[in-house]
């Protein structure tokens, strides 16, 4: 790729961040962007190296990247990650950890650039074929996408590896080779070492043709996105859940297309045909009083009444009890659920007695008598009346004085906790993330 081509992709004052592994692709990319940045001094350029810790050479690679960046007078940060491949395999786990680390290291306005090239695109399409993917999977890697709130750009995607090698030799670049790239147990390496050389020898432009097919699949998916956007918007509720009864009376093809797009929009990727069938049979078609759930990696699909919810997996808080000895200090809740703090702006709760300890729990059972109501009711019935989904019930902070339930902030005050003669206070729950509500 020549330098002028970057002008069509980047603004002169762009803040650029290169995912720099030290391999051929990212070395060429960083070198080219260094030249572009010198022509656009108002722009900024830095590198991020992800240290996976999987190879005995990982420390040496990190040092190499830092040395190259010092020579080129570019900032370089090393991001250390832990890779757990027990669930989805080392390749997928390393990729997930890498992108999470890169995303967390980006600042507002940064553009992340990665070095995938034409041969990588060809491999991605063939792997999608091997998995039996549909058009969305066969569309492979887009030139640009969002990584959280930041753009991710692949400027070398139409360049064959051979041209990158020629560029590196011409400019006397030094790069590292990951020994794991020779391990044929990994599918991508098998394609790269065994299959693709044969295909390229028979059909020299096989990679270009594959990329064209991927682009056509991408266009078809974009068209479907446009055609289904209005109907999908009608089904998605304010909390992000999906109203599913209309899906049950439309064609399976249309229903599956809408489900796929909703799940992808929730960050769940594109589900397989088998996964969609399980959603229909085990979740949508289950009896009305059931509480079906399907796990997908680190998320799960659940149903409550007429809605589907895509939820992150959380550790149970059922047995957690937090002491709140000093009500003048805010109390941070676990798992990013926010903060509790006391306020005298309203007299909703009575003050605790000297012998009453204030605590926060996430589970209660038995009868509860709400302030201003006659008689009590079972907690389960109360949650149903308040339309609180089952998974949220143990993620709401319950305020206790000793063993007596006093209130759930923002929801209700019990008879035992109600203020008398306008002498009292209130507890305010500042939610750090709506994630805790789901």
Each predicted region: which residue ranges?
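AMP-forming adenylation/ATP pyrophosphatase catalytic core
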Residues: 2-24, 43, 81-83, 97, ...
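Hydrophobic/aromatic-lined pockets within catalytic cores
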Residues: 130, 200, 263-267
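Core alpha/beta nucleotide-donor-binding catalytic domains of modification enzymes
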Residues: 1-197, 226
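Short coil/loop linkers at secondary-structure junctions
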Residues: 75, 174, 205, 269-270, ...
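Conserved anion/nucleotide-ligand pocket segment
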Residues: 193-194, 198-210
């Amino acid at each position: 790729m020549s330098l002028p081509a970057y002008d069509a992709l980047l603004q002169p004052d762009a803040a650029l961040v290169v995912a720099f592994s030290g391999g051929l692709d990212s070395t060429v990319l960083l070198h080219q962007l260094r030249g572009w940045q010198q022509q656009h001094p108002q722009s900024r350029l830095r590198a991020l190296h992800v240290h996976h810790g999987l190879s005995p050479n990982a420390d040496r690679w990190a040092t190499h990247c830092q040395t190259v960046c010092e020579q080129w007078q570019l900032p370089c940060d090393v991001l250390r990650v832990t890779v757990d491949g027990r669930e989805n395999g080392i390749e997928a786990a390393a990729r997930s950890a890498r992108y999470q680390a890169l995303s967390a290291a980006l600042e507002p306005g940064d553009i992340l650039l990665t070095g995938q090239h034409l041969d990588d695109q060809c491999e991605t399409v063939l792997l999608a074929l091997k998995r039996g993917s549909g058009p969305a999977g066969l569309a492979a890697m887009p030139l640009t996408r969002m990584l959280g709130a930041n753009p991710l750009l692949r400027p070398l995607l139409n360049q064959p590896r051979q041209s990158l090698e020629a560029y590196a030799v011409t400019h006397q670049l030094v790069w590292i080779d990951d020994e794991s790239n020779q391990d044929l147990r990994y599918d991508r390496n098998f394609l790269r070492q065994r299959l693709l050389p044969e295909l390229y020898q028979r059909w020299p432009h096989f990679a270009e043709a594959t990329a064209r097919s991927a682009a056509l699949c991408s266009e078809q998916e974009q068209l479907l996105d446009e055609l289904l956007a209005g109907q999908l918007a009608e089904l998605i509720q304010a909390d992000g859940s999906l109203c599913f009864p209309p899906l049950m009376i439309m064609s399976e093809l249309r229903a599956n297309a809408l489900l796929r797009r909703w799940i992808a929009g929730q960050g769940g990727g594109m589900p397989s045909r088998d996964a969609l069938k399980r959603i229909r049979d085990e979740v949508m078609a289950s009896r009305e009083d059931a509480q079906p759930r399907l796990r997908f990696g680190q998320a799960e699909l659940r149903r409550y009444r007429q809605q589907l919810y895509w939820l992150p997996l959380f550790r149970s808080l059922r047995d957690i009890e937090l002491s709140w000895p000093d009500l003048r200090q805010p109390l941070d809740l676990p798992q990013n659920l926010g903060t509790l703090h006391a306020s005298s702006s309203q007299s909703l709760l009575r003050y605790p007695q000297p012998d009453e300890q204030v605590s926060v729990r996430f589970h209660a059972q038995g009868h509860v008598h709400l302030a201003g109501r006659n008689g009590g009711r079972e907690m389960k019935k109360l949650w149903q009346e308040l339309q609180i989904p089952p998974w949220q019930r143990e993620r709401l902070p319950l305020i206790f004085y000793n063993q007596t339930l006093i209130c759930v902030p923002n929801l209700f005050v019990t008879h035992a906790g109600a203020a008398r003669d306008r002498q009292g206070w209130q507890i305010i729950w500042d939610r750090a993330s709506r994630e805790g509500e789901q």
